[in-house]
């Protein structure tokens, strides 16, 4: 089973370890994702996000560039085992050469500081997908999760605030560049703004089904149908809060069976063609049945048992 995963936060963990003076080897580490585990899991493609937390106090562009630097150094260190991709054809070439493909993405469009020039520079550096937001409203759009807001369970969606004029300009430029617009983390209104103001397929790199787990980070059935009509894809997120519907968030679980349940819902509402994986590995905690990227056979078994056959 060849695996595609649209989202992980491994780059930020590698950068954090370097900053702490305890650098990790990407070949083999204690992270959810490393090269050895990717090979064991039979991965064809892993997307690596340069993750930026606007609330950290760091310069967001510097953070993104430093994580992109980590990505490039990892690729240079293991050229016979993993290689970056810039076009779809690169995936086939890497597979033919026995290499895993790695796609560079950005999680937090606010790192561009509103500059289309920075966006174009990120594309030149190899970024091929970007979320407009993370968990903060920024100069491009509103997010659904409000990091500084009082905790409410389940998280209520933002149906009032969407893309700004600058955000609309970013969507247009991303489409011109063929950089994928990623709507994970985006507010509900922002999602529909993307639907109305874009023409190409977009992605929700790590979002599940709100009908099964009522967190605002998940997609409604109406959203899923709109994405399917456009030829979009959505990545199944392994985070406990986005999979389970327990009244107490601390009781939420992450199991292969729950992931397969969301896959079946995506198939029922939007069709099997839109389903991808978006593990969020190295960006999520809690008890995970699939606790690293080598454990994908557990999901393959669960999909067969649940007759999702994705």
Task: Please identify what each model-predicted range represents.
Residues 184, 205-207, 237, 278:
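Generic beta-strand/beta-sheet core signal
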Residues 155-195, 201-205:
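Loop-centered beta-sheet repeat module
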Residues 52, 208-209:
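Acidic, glycine-rich active-site loops and adjacent beta-strand->loop/helix elements
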Residues 8-10, 185-188, 209, 283:
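Short, glycine/acidic-enriched loop or turn micro-motifs at the edges of active sites
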Residues 1-156, 199, 214-307:
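N-terminal hydrophobic targeting/anchoring segments and the immediately downstream early-domain regions
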Residues 188-189, 209-211, 240-243:
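Short, catalytically relevant binding-site loops at active-site mouths
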């Amino acid at each position: 089973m060849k695996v595609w995963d649209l989202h992980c936060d491994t780059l930020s963990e590698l950068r954090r370890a370097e900053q702490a003076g305890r650098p990790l080897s990407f070949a083999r580490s204690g992270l959810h994702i490393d090269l050895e585990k990717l090979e064991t899991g039979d991965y064809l493609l892993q997307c690596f996000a340069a993750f930026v937390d606007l609330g950290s106090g760091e310069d967001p562009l510097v953070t993104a560039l430093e994580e992109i630097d980590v990505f490039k150094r990892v690729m240079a260190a293991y050229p016979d085992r993993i290689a970056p991709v810039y076009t779809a054809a690169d995936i086939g070439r890497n597979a033919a050469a026995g290499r895993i493909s790695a796609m560079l993405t950005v999680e937090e469009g606010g790192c561009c500081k509103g500059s289309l020039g920075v966006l174009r520079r990120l594309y030149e550096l190899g970024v091929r997908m970007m979320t407009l937001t993370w968990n903060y409203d920024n100069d491009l759009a509103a997010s659904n999760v409000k990091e500084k807001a009082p905790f409410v369970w389940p998280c209520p969606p933002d149906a009032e605030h969407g893309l700004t004029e600058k955000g609309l300009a970013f969507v247009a430029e991303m489409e011109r560049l063929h950089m994928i617009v990623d709507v994970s983390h985006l507010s509900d209104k922002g999602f529909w703004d993307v639907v109305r103001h874009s023409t190409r397929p977009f992605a929700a790199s790590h979002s599940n089904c709100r009908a099964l787990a009522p967190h605002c980070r998940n997609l409604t059935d109406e959203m899923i149908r709109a994405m399917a009509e456009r030829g979009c894809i959505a990545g199944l997120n392994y985070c406990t809060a986005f999979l389970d519907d327990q009244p107490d968030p601390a009781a939420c679980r992450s199991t292969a069976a729950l992931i397969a349940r969301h896959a079946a819902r995506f198939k029922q509402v939007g069709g099997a063609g839109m389903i991808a994986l978006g593990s969020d590995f190295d960006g999520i905690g809690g008890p995970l049945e699939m606790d690293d990227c080598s454990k994908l056979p557990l999901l393959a078994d669960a999909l067969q048992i649940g007759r999702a056959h994705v």
